[in-house]
Amino acid sequence: MAKTEKLLNRLEELRQETGVARTIFAVCPNSLSVIRASFRAAKRNNAPIYFAATLNQIDGDGGYTGMTQSMFTKMLQFEADRVNYTGCSIVAIDHGGPWLKDKQRVEKWSTEDAMNGVKKSFEDAALAGYDLIHVDPTVDINVAKGDVIDIH
């Protein structure tokens, strides 16, 4: 069964057991402390957890957390094991797209370089075992502020 389906089924099971509707507990993993606290909270509440990492946080260059995608998934497994968290977890790229990584925008990467960079990030995430990739094509540094991006 796909992880997302398992997660949604678990939320429905909890609703039926308790009569309380729940939402998905999503975490922006910007530090080890946040990740550890998230696993403890998810375990305490018998809840599934969704880690939504931006490319600024976690990427091939280490992002500002110092973690690559592979390091991140290994660390998540280690931390889950450390607190004996056995619930469902989803690992995702959040807002992945060209120029959404600060470095690409600040350094004014070309369209080709920005696209190649994000494709490499997506590939690394898939190889590391990510469950979801949120593709976000909403930034184009070549479009004037206020103009609509022509996505074709």
Segments (PLM) and residue ranges:
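Terminal catalytic/cofactor-binding subdomain
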Residues: 21-22, 31-35, 72
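Glycine-/proline-rich flexible loop or hinge segments
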Residues: 19-23, 52-64
